[in-house]
Amino acid sequence: MRGDSFIWSLATAIPLLSTAVESLKVVKRDNPSVLGFDIERFQAAKPVHRDIIAKRASTKTISQDLDNQKNLYFCNLTLGTPPQTIRAHIDTGSSDLWVNTAESRFCSSRRAPCSQGGTYDSSSSSTYQLVNNDFNISYVDGSGATGDYVTDVINVGGIKLKDFQFAIGHTSSSPLGVLGIGYEAGEAQVTRSGDQSYPNLPAALVKAGHIRSNAYSLWLNDLSASRGQILFGGIDTGKFQGKLQTVPVLHTSRGDYTSLVVALTGVGIRTGSDGSIDTFPSQPVAVAMDSGSSLSYLPDALAAKVYNSVDAVFDPANNLAFVPCSMANDKRKLVFTFSSPQIAVGMDELVIDLGPDANGNEATFRDGSKACVFGIAPAGSSISILGDTVLRSAYLVYDLDNNEISIAPTRFNSTETNIMEIGTGENSVPDATGVPNAVTSAQVTQATGLPGVETGVPGSRPPSSKAAGQAKRPDFVLGVAAVGLAGAGMLFAAM
């Protein structure tokens, strides 16, 4: 993030809801073992740029900043004795907490870019201990963070953990640190150095007895909402419709679970009032369910079919598609299927307003209509990702103990709350059912280009003669505007 942007603050300790999944026991208790945070929005800048950069990363472990095109999702926490306040991105796609230090070249620059996120000073903490110097997360362009693994006291959501391991970024290029909550096997010291894993935040909460299972639920709410919610060790049945349906997380060819990846078995568009869906032909695709990615990334051929269905125009210079901003009022929905459960995503969640550039100019098409980014991008040779443009329309339960993800349609802006605790074991629960014969393997992304999709240099063609709502090329170069799009993207742990 560079400049102003929307940030979501996960700050308040509240009773949390347990996510129900096939192998989890969900229990209604008067005092559930759940840790929860409200997710609050804060103005942030350039939510798309680092998504674009990060997609070029060459390493295998994903780490993300939780930007959702306009929004970052972050939590307030403290580290050390006495406490030092930090804002860190909540990220299901990575596994380490890392924070900046004020002495880094990036943070000590004249613009003081790290003042918003806060920094950690190990010399000011009486409980600091050095672990090793193996921390290294990097972007493909050489940016990222390197430094030390340390232990210290952490306080998050009113819960204090002693001797908690995290990383200090002595060299970094991000003004905000990252709170990764993925698999321990995805930690940078494991993937880079082959060292043993350590208990990251969800695992440490289990170890300390604050929650019963290494599982959490995520409710991002809609694009314009001021609050969402994450619950460690619980679910909130007031935040989703119907029943949770559980699908397996896919493992690597070695049988390891390192990323929260499931099989996407279908993508289509719902066009009629009868609810019928026109499905785009495709084989099952392995997709990361990654709240840290602003955009969603599909295999090139599948992205091309989506673009053609909504008359989007692709800009290869920025790896983005554009549509008229008026498409946000379109009633069609993209539908994503996972063996059985579906996420139906409205156009109002997929059409992203760029806002003005540094000179106050807004992107427009040659006919004068305002141009917006479409929230689906081609994955190229990288893994496919369902980011915030899709995940906002779902209620998700990430069960790392049982290697499952449960999915239900979200209830946008719901004020209803019903907290349930996630227990342990393999008993089925009323709020979640396993999907029979769920797909357990899927192909990885292959770069094929975008056959049949209209492309071109901005301003290179006249206004389209097609039906109203078709995207036309913006009439000024979008390189600057697109930089303002990219906010936080995915980090890849260096291998």
From Swiss-Prot:
Annotated glycosylation sites: N76, N136, N413
Signal peptide annotation: 1-19
Keyword Glycoprotein: yes
Recorded topology in the membrane: Lipid-anchor; GPI-anchor
GO biological process: proteolysis
Major subcellular site: membrane
Keyword Cell membrane: yes
Domain Peptidase A1 per the UniProt entry, residue ranges: 73-408
GO cellular component, one term: side of membrane
Disordered: annotated segments: 448-470
Enzyme Commission identifier(s): 3.4.23.-
InterPro entries found in the cross-reference section: Aspartic_peptidase_A1, PEPTIDASE_A1, Peptidase_aspartic_dom_sf, SAP-like
Keywords noted in UniProt: Aspartyl protease, Cell membrane, Glycoprotein, GPI-anchor, Hydrolase, Lipoprotein, Membrane, Protease, Signal, Virulence, Zymogen
Superkingdom of origin organism: Eukaryota
Compartments, record wording: Cell membrane
Active site: D91, D290
Propeptide residue intervals: 468-495
Any one GO molecular function term: aspartic-type endopeptidase activity
Residues covalently joined to lipid (GPI-anchor amidated alanine): A467
PANTHER family referenced in this protein's UniProt entry, alphabetically: ASPARTIC-TYPE ENDOPEPTIDASE (PTHR47966:SF65), BETA-SITE APP-CLEAVING ENZYME, ISOFORM A-RELATED (PTHR47966)
Family: Belongs to the peptidase A1 family.
Function: Probable GPI-anchored aspartic-type endopeptidase which contributes to virulence.
Protein's name according to its UniProt entry: Probable aspartic-type endopeptidase OPSB
Species of origin: Trichophyton verrucosum (strain HKI 0517)
Gene name for this UniProt entry: OPSB
